[in-house]
A protein has these predicted regions:
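Blade-edge beta-strand/turn elements of extracellular beta-propeller
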Residues: 44-46, 118-128, 168-178, 251-263, ...
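Repeat-based blade/solenoid architectures
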Residues: 53-75, 126-138, 177-189, 238, ...
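Bacterial N-terminal signal peptides
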Residues: 9-20
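Beta-propeller blade signature
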Residues: 108-113, 241-248, 299, 355-356, ...
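Short, conserved, GDST-rich strand-edge loop motifs in beta-rich repeat architectures
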Residues: 92-106, 205-237, 399-416
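Beta-propeller blade termini
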Residues: 73-83, 112, 133-147, 162, ...
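Gly/Ser/Thr/Pro-enriched helix-cap/hinge segments flanking short amphipathic alpha-helices
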Residues: 26, 30, 36, 43, ...
Length: 581
């Protein structure tokens, strides 16, 4: 199986040129993305320091990691917590194994958007200065009061913050019954799985882990990597169990993991969560990227239960039938056929994976055919489809970083800090690596983890926030204006959940119909700007915007002006019977 992929990588190298990539272990394409001359399509700089995103991330040891707990890093969220129309930034933080003075404990950070390219840290004022082994974050208005609430996952008890609407948050975890079982939670997503108008909550769980009994580097086979003692896991450690909470509508949730048959899928190390209606039946499904084990694709049975169909659907393994070490995931219609596809990042000595949706309930691994099989050196985490040049074709951003600091000392063919990768969608089902010309925000090496994207300044140019291990976050700002048009859609549910999470949006512009969904969560344990962004290319108008709401209502909105964020309220459009379920 490995050799099949190795030969495929070598074939691509030869097709590109004799010097395009240099084979290494397992067909490793060892050339860095920063080594080829290219025309600038996008140019990203890291503007975090100037913008005020200065708080360091703290996550375990710096030079060595004794336990797997110290390696996973944290997610980030882009959301408008104060409803001023400008997205703000929330960065989850971790801690260390050693003792630390109480007043110096690292905390999560909330940054308020000042509308001028800068942010102000309002963490203390907002009541979000929580400490612990933070992991992921997802956003959703669970009580439909018009203000976005925050759910933060931890190694330990998770936390639900209710947005009070006055710039502050209240920890309502115990009241809401969503703390979990004290396990190691990772990715999460608010999702109205039963379409009752109230957001439910799905939480992925990684490893059943206890520092007191965990093996140490070199203790067993799973504690070695390429002959070097490293932290142990996840293989050899007990797996966690994913959780589902049903929103009762009174400020509380009910644990329905067993009732919904979520726990019938076992033996997986769950990492990131992405929701999508992959079979277009109007009911949200759930994809979980899993470390060192097959991915999970929970199909919504429309009766309050789910069935894992990843294997039969072709989304559990790569095309060689090999389970991969999945980290992050993103959803998008990369080839413009109206179906939602899945992209997943993986561990080093492997490629990322692109699953093309065939429209019949199955997927094909088209990684190599799409030109995405170039790199096996990097260890991928956060990833997102985003249209960097607004040409109407979603591009791909990948964040990388190794888990073993030892790679720098032992010269194992990888670096602990790795560059990001930016692929430009060519509009013909393939991608081109444009990292070399995409600016220092892409080519500078960091040990990245979480990634969220959004239109931070409402100008149609998508920015990205990246959490970095034991360093401040990065704020990747695109300096180029493409000249293409765009539109952003903010959904406001009335019968459906207020955020419109789960709504499928179709935009008709010229000869193209663009498709995406409103979703919470995704990437690596992160949450993106939920205003859905569409690049329109040279089209100077949109014919219509169609929204299929979770309630089942499908309606069209006409005469929406382009080059701006437009709000669409459920029930205010023209009813359309072409997509109701």
């Amino acid at each position: 199986l490995v050799r099949t992929r190795q030969l495929r990588v070598l074939a691509i190298c030869v097709a590109l040129s004799s010097h395009a990539c240099i084979p290494g272990p397992f067909g490793q394409a060892s050339q860095k993305p920063a080594e080829r001359e290219q025309k600038k399509i996008a140019y990203f700089v890291d503007d975090a320091a100037r913008a005020g995103l200065n708080a360091p991330n703290t996550f375990g040891g710096v030079d060595t990691k004794k336990f797997i707990l110290e390696t996973t890093g944290t997610g980030v969220a882009i959301f408008d917590y104060d409803n001023d129309g400008w997205p703000d930034i929330f960065v989850v933080n971790g801690t260390t194994l050693g003792p630390m003075p109480e007043k110096k404990q690292p905390t999560n950070h909330l940054y308020h958007n000042n509308h001028d390219g800068t942010f102000t840290d309002v963490t203390e004022k907002a009541g979000l200065a929580h400490s612990g082994w933070g992991q992921g974050v997802c956003v959703g208005d669970y009580d439909n009061d018009g203000y976005e609430d925050l759910f933060v996952t931890y190694y330990g008890k998770n936390v639900l913050y209710h947005n009070n609407g006055d710039g502050t948050f209240t920890d309502v975890t115990e009241k809401a019954h969503v703390a979990g079982n004290g396990a190691w939670s990772t990715g999460c997503a608010f999702v109205d799985y039963d379409r009752d108008g109230k957001l439910d909550l799905f939480v992925a769980t990684y490893v059943d882990f206890d520092v007191k009994t965990a093996p140490v580097p070199g203790e067993r086979a799973s504690c070695m990597w390429k002959g070097v003692p490293v932290m142990c896991g996840p293989r050899g450690l007990p797996w966690g169990k994913n959780m589902l909470f049903h929103n009762k509508g009174d400020g509380t949730f009910e644990a329905v993991t067993t009732k919904a048959k979520i726990d019938q899928t076992n033996g997986h190390y769950g990492f990131s969560v992405s929701t999508l209606d992959f079979d277009d039946d109007g009911w949200p499904d759930i994809f979980v990227a899993c470390d060192s084990t097959p991915s999970i694709l929970y199909h919504n049975n429309r009766d309050g239960t789910f069935t894992d169909v990843a294997v039969v659907a072709g989304a559990a393994f790569n095309e060689d039938g090999k389970e991969q070490a999945g980290m992050g995931s993103t959803i998008g219609d990369y080839n413009g056929d109206g179906r939602l596809d899945i992209f997943k990042t993986n561990f080093s000595d492997d490629t990322a994976t692109l699953y093309r949706n065939n429209g019949d309930g199955t997927f094909d691994d088209v990684t190599f055919a799409a030109g995405l099989g170039l790199y096996t050196k990097y260890l991928g985490w956060g990833t997102m489809f985003l249209d960097v040049d607004n040409d109407g074709w979603p591009d791909l951003l990948l964040v990388n970083g190794h888990v073993y600091p030892e790679v720098d000392k032992q010269h194992l063919g990888s670096d602990y800090q790795e560059p990001r990768i930016l692929y430009h969608n060519k509009g013909n089902g393939t991608f081109e690596d444009i990292s070399a010309s995409a600016g220092p925000g892409i080519t500078t090496a960091k040990s990245g983890r979480g990634l969220a994207v959004g239109d931070l300044w409402n100008d149609g140019r998508m920015s990205a926030v990246v959490s970095n291990m034991n360093a401040p976050a990065s704020l990747l700002v695109n300096q180029l204006k493409s000249g293409n048009h765009w539109i952003g859609i903010k959904t406001i549910g009335t019968k459906s959940n207020r955020d419109g999470i789960g709504a499928k949006i179709r935009v008709k512009a010229g000869e193209r119909v663009l498709v995406d969904e409103v979703r919470s969560g995704s990437s690596y344990d992160s949450n993106n700007d939920m205003r859905v962004h569409f690049g329109l290319g040279h089209n100077e108008r949109v014919d219509w915007v169609e929204v299929r709401w979770p309630s089942g209502l499908t309606e069209r909105f006409s005469n929406l002006q382009i080059d701006g964020i437009r709000s669409v309220r459920e029930g205010s459009g023209a009813a359309f019977n072409g997509g109701a379920h």
